[in-house]
Amino acid sequence: MTTTTAVSPDRFKPCLRCPEEGPAVYVACLAAYNAGTLHGKWVDLSAVSKLVFTESGMATVLQQCIDLVLADSPEPGAEEWAIHDTQGLPKVLMGENPDLSELAAFTRQWELACEDSDDDAFRVWCDHIGEVQTYEDFREAYRGSWDSEADFVQDFYEQNGKDLGELSSYIDWEQVWYGEFSCDGWWSEYAGDGVYWVFSS
């Protein structure tokens, strides 16, 4: 990808770092790469988000951060760049030339998810859908974290007024998950540490 914008570095330098966690991209200068030199910097997307109020404004600031990386290149007049590494992004945004507006949109929605400690589940959900989604849409589909799909199904029946009494102990809830829920588009993701995230269709 090519860029030509000239920017003042001071405002955006705090964004040129890799955070301990959260979304970030490594911007590489292709002119330097093709000349046999590695030149690039991490861009902290959350730090970029803090500078502006809108997603479109964030995409503009992100482009200006990229311009700073190129301005500092050992190759004079460098214009082309690519993303050579990422952190905390869904796979759908892991290409060399992601849409900057999509990076901005994901970061803003991820920040909303962080407020409810749903950031990891939100990222997995975007991967499953295959595109960046809103946190509001995520909340409509997300059914929480469970020890197993079977535990979720049993609770689902109980919460919806289906009192099975003693029959509950004879039901294979795992088979109910696969035979009824999974076949109807519900899905789960193993989050580690014995926890499953469950999503509706």
How would you describe each model-predicted region?
Residues 96-99, 108, 120, 138, ...:
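Extracellular/secreted glycoprotein ectodomains characterized by long, lumenal stretches
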Residues 50-130:
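Structured domain cores in non-transmembrane regions
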Residues 2-68:
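N-terminal ordered "arm"
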